[in-house]
């Protein structure tokens, strides 16, 4: 494997990776110590809402997964869990003192980095690994309380288009919103839909702690949360371990460690002021923007990209031009793709144009067909069916084999299914169902498919997808749901309340009138048309 063109030996690998991670943020200045100390000196006694109770610490300790890998302090999670009643009182005092002073001890900030491959085999270290930080177990417990306080405040002003690591939001909801915009726009064949899939380069590693601190202050975060959160990040040290080889520890000026509870929260806050006038979604560091126009030279998306580049320059972030892609969706005959100018990023580098892109685990194609995604799922699970054969031949109880099937195969076939289920063709739906038939045939060789479903207690995959869609839509119908605004009421809420007895049989939402069959591939339109 190589790093920046140089071959790296296994013995040198941990130090090389650690030095590379340090070099990423070396140019970013460390935390302004005087400003942080002034903030700490302004802290008064912790408000009652920020005082952790001994019982809460006891519950957190007793819920630790005993199988968790020890952090760099080598403190056993099993020991902490089994002796939670003994550790609760002293740990509670330490956490409350840490919050009151806005100081996190260096032992809690030391992390062991495990490089997780993004692909196999790893060839380019700068692109093919994700550094996951393992922190002390006690630090994670303290983080869990601070993350709760952080979110209580942040949820009041979080960007409505941010779906990542947020209660009540998920990848499925993000994809439903995004796909709905695409399908609605494509119902008019004159519309040219340009989608920009943005990839940040080393996003978590480039977070400037000073800028993060000022953003917390600007958004009126309680000073105890601000001081503690920045203290957890400043002057932190890390080392890389691969097998039995360990690097030397090195300090970092910037960045949020991936694998911690506070990492995604800090990043979401950092990019919370990154907004667009165009339709867009954010899932932590995954950002997607779309422009809809009947003019092939409409500059809206280019302007959005220019604004993004300006934001990155101010916030010390970088766009990975090589991984940032554009997809054009157009069903008209008036223009050719060649009439649509390429997007230009930094230094006039063109953004590559693709016909298919994998967004949050789901493949979107320029023809708004799910063939690419279905093929991807079938190929992925085909390699796993062999495990069902092995378990069955080994004489493992059939109920246990069914559980394995549900865990490693069915879960893949149902990921974000409300997004793509409405647009499946009969052939695609049948090919997905055939995977379950094949697995049950292996587990129950003497039974037909209907009998195997009864014995195993499973439903047809098509039935499960329909139930999942109906259940999710029932949630969206609640007025407080994130996506409820996508539904247009037939009458005003006040009128509905006055006449609710008369209107029980009346469907409360407008049914979309589609010009083409494409609109009915949208989850929202599908559910409304079927009056779920």
Language model features by range: what are they?
Residues 67-75, 113, 124-134, 173-217:
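Conserved catalytic palm subdomain of right-hand nucleotidyl-transferase polymerases, strongest
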Residues 71, 110-113, 130, 162-166, ...:
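Catalytic palm active-site di-aspartate
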Residues 1-126, 133, 137-141, 158, ...:
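Surface-exposed loop/turn segments and immediately adjacent short secondary-structure elements
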Residues 1-19, 50-95, 100-107, 113, ...:
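Short, charged alpha-helical motifs in flexible N/C-terminal segments and linkers
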Residues 303, 318-355:
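Short, conserved micro-motifs composed of acidic
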Residues 274, 349-419:
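Basic, alpha-helical interaction scaffolds
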Residues 198-283, 292:
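Conserved polymerase palm-domain catalytic core
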Residues 146-163, 185-187, 264-290:
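Active-site palm subdomain of RNA-directed nucleic acid polymerases
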């Amino acid at each position: 494997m190589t790093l920046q063109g140089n071959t790296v030996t296994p013995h040198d690998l941990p130090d090389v990776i650690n030095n590379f991670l340090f070099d990423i943020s070396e140019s970013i200045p460390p935390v302004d110590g005087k400003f942080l100390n002034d903030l700490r000196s302004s802290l008064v006694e912790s408000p009652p809402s920020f005082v952790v109770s001994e019982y809460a610490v006891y519950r957190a300790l007793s819920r630790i997964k005993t199988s968790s890998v020890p952090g760099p302090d080598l403190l056993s999670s099993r020991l902490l869990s089994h002796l939670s009643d003994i550790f609760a009182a002293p740990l509670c005092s330490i956490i409350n003192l840490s919050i009151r002073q806005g100081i996190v001890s260096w032992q809690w900030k030391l992390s062991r980095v495990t490089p997780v491959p993004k692909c196999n085999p790893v060839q380019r270290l700068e692109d093919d690994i994700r550094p996951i930080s393992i922190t002390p177990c006690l630090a994670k417990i303290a983080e869990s309380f601070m993350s709760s306080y952080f979110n209580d405040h942040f949820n009041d002003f979080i960007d409505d288009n941010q779906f990542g690591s947020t209660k009540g939001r998920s990848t499925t909801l993000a994809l439903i919103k995004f796909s709905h915009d695409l399908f609605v726009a494509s119902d008019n064949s004159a519309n040219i839909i340009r989608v920009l899939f943005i990839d940040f380069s080393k996003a978590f590693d480039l977070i400037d702690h000073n800028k993060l601190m000022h953003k917390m202050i600007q958004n009126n975060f309680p000073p105890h949360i601000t001081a503690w959160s920045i203290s957890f990040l400043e002057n932190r040290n890390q080392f890389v371990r691969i097998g039995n080889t360990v690097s030397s520890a090195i300090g970092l000026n910037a960045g949020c460690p991936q694998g911690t509870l506070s990492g995604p929260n800090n990043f979401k806050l950092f990019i919370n002021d990154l907004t667009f006038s165009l339709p867009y979604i954010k899932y932590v560091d995954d950002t997607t923007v779309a422009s809809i126009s009947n003019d092939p030279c409409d500059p809206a998306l280019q302007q959005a990209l220019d604004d993004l580049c300006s934001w990155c320059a101010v916030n010390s972030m970088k766009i990975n031009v090589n991984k940032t892609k554009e997809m054009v969706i157009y069903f008209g005959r008036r223009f050719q793709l060649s009439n649509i100018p390429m997007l230009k990023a930094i230094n006039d580098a063109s953004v590559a144009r693709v016909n298919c892109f994998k967004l949050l685990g789901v493949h979107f194609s320029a023809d708004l067909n799910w063939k690419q995604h279905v093929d991807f799922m079938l190929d992925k699970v085909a390699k796993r069916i062999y495990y069902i054969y092995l378990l069955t031949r080994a004489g493992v109880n059939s109920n246990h084999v069914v559980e394995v099937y549900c865990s490693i195969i069915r879960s893949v076939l149902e990921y974000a299914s409300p997004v793509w289920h409405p647009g499946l063709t009969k052939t695609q739906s049948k090919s997905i169902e055939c995977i379950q038939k094949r697995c049950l045939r292996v587990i129950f060789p003497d039974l037909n498919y209907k009998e195997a479903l009864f014995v195993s207690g499973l439903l047809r995959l098509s039935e499960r997808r329909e139930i999942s869609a109906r259940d999710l839509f029932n949630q969206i119908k609640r007025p407080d749901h994130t996506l409820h605004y996508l539904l247009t009421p037939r009458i005003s809420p006040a009128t509905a309340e006055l006449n609710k007895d008369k209107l029980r049989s009346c469907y409360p939402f407008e049914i979309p009138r589609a010009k083409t069959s494409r609109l009915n591939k949208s989850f929202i339109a599908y559910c409304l048309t079927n009056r779920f």
